[in-house]
């Protein structure tokens, strides 16, 4: 079938399944999208270093992503959510080209309503329904106060 590097987007604290975020870009990813629950797929890895989750405990967290870059951070966000009392201030900044390309929209809405997560969504090209910030993913930094000495960033 093929192979491609794909990020796990589910929390490692959830057992018995994993969630992957895969954009359709060619034959291999098209085949993945057509798979049904219960189909078998081979996996290799994990590759990379992961996040220093245990070292992050007790600190503020700043997570910044654009587009598909939110997929691996979603895993970290969900893990932080599962152990929320272990962390200080949590700030999430996510940017997308336009509102229709905002990934995990329902989950962002849930995070937005939490009082213990600061969430900033921004798009480059808003439509009439957009009520978030407009501009590059760096736009929210104009008004954020970050304690650099006590903050882990990803």
List each language-model region with its residue ranges:
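Reductase modules of NAD(P)H-dependent flavoproteins
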Residues: 93, 97-154
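A short acidic Gly-Thr/Ser loop motif
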Residues: 66-67, 154
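A short, hydrophobic beta-strand micro-motif
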Residues: 40-45
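Histidine-anchored nucleotide/phosphate-binding helix
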Residues: 70-84
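A short, basic/flexible loop-to-alpha-helix module at the beginning of a structural domain
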Residues: 46-57
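Acidic/glycine-rich phosphate/pyrophosphate-binding loops and surrounding catalytic core
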Residues: 55-60, 64, 74-78
């Amino acid at each position: 079938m093929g192979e491609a590097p794909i990020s796990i987007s589910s929390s490692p604290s959830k057992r018995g399944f994993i969630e992957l975020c895969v954009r359709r870009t060619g034959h291999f990813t098209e085949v993945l999208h057509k798979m049904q629950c219960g189909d078998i797929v081979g996996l290799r890895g994990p590759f990379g270093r992961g996040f220093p989750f245990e070292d992050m405990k007790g600190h503020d967290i700043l997570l910044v992503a654009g587009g598909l870059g939110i997929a691996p951070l979603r895993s970290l966000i969900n893990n932080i959510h599962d152990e929320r009392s272990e962390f200080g201030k949590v700030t999430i900044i996510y940017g997308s080209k336009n509102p229709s390309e905002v990934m995990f929209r329902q989950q962002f809405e849930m995070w937005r309503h939490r009082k213990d997560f600061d969430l900033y969504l921004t798009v480059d090209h808003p439509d009439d329904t957009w009520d978030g910030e407009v501009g590059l993913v760096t736009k929210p930094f104009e008004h954020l106060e970050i304690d650099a000495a006590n903050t882990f960033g990803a």
